[in-house]
């Protein structure tokens, strides 16, 4: 049987998740040529963990306003972004996506604790599934901010943000947001 590759170009076999705690939640086992599962795999408490990571990222691009619900458009834009990433870095775009998610997920956050009418914030650890969700949300927010009312295309914005986040660069919106969240959590210890 032939190997299934993303967009018939990028192999799932080469992708490694370097963070041990995130490895069970970054799903690379459900392989598809196109990041569209169209199944009921999201049932249960940890249903998001069974969705392929490329599809979760594509679905996050569809949110908020003009592009909501246009999954085919989001898949085509992600395919163009994968081509740009591969031509700029000579790396597998799936590996760049996984590294960007690992680097932009905060490890600590703050929670509000209230007793007797008084509220205070305290530092808490973030679960791996929540860490991935925050990372994907921050990546897509940075991409939206970079391409809104700008000459840069959405595919170029995706490529720039993912490359910057995968190298842990300060140019990435998601990495800066992660550092801000962790700094606030550290001050509330």
Curated annotation (Swiss-Prot):
Q: Which GO terms describe its molecular function?
A: structural constituent of ribosome
> Pfam family of this protein, just one?
Ribosomal_S7
**Alphabetic keyword roster:** Cytoplasm, Ribonucleoprotein, Ribosomal protein
Could you give one GO CC term from the UniProt record? Answer: small ribosomal subunit
The answer to whether the entry has keyword RNA-binding is no
GO BP annotations of the record are:
translation
List where in the cell it is found: Cytoplasm
Entries under InterPro entries matching the protein: Ribosomal_uS7, Ribosomal_uS7_dom, Ribosomal_uS7_dom_sf, Ribosomal_uS7_euk/arc
Family per similarity comment: Belongs to the universal ribosomal protein uS7 family.
Quaternary form?
Component of the small ribosomal subunit.
This one is known as Small ribosomal subunit protein uS7
- Biological source species: Encephalitozoon cuniculi (strain GB-M1) (Microsporidian parasite)
**Phylogenetic lineage:** Eukaryota, Fungi, Fungi incertae sedis, Microsporidia, Unikaryonidae
């Amino acid at each position: 049987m032939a190997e299934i590759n993303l967009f018939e170009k990028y192999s799932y076999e080469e992708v490694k998740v370097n963070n041990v705690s995130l490895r069970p939640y970054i799903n690379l086992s459900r392989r598809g040529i196109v990041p569209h599962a169209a199944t009921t795999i999201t049932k249960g408490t940890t249903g998001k963990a069974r969705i392929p990571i490329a599809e979760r990222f594509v679905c996050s691009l569809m949110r908020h306003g003009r592009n909501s619900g246009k999954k085919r458009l989001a898949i085509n834009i992600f395919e163009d972004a994968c081509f740009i990433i591969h031509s700029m870095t000579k790396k597998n775009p799936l590996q760049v996506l996984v590294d960007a998610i690992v680097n932009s997920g905060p490890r600590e956050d703050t929670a509000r604790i209230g007793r007797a009418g008084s509220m205070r914030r305290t530092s808490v650890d973030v679960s791996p599934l929540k860490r991935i969700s925050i990372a994907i949300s921050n990546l897509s927010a940075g991409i939206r901010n970079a391409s809104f009312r700008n000459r840069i295309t959405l595919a170029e914005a995706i490529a720039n943000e993912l490359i910057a986040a995968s190298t842990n660069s300060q140019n990435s919106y998601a990495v800066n947001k992660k550092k801000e969240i962790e700094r606030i959590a550290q001050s509330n210890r």
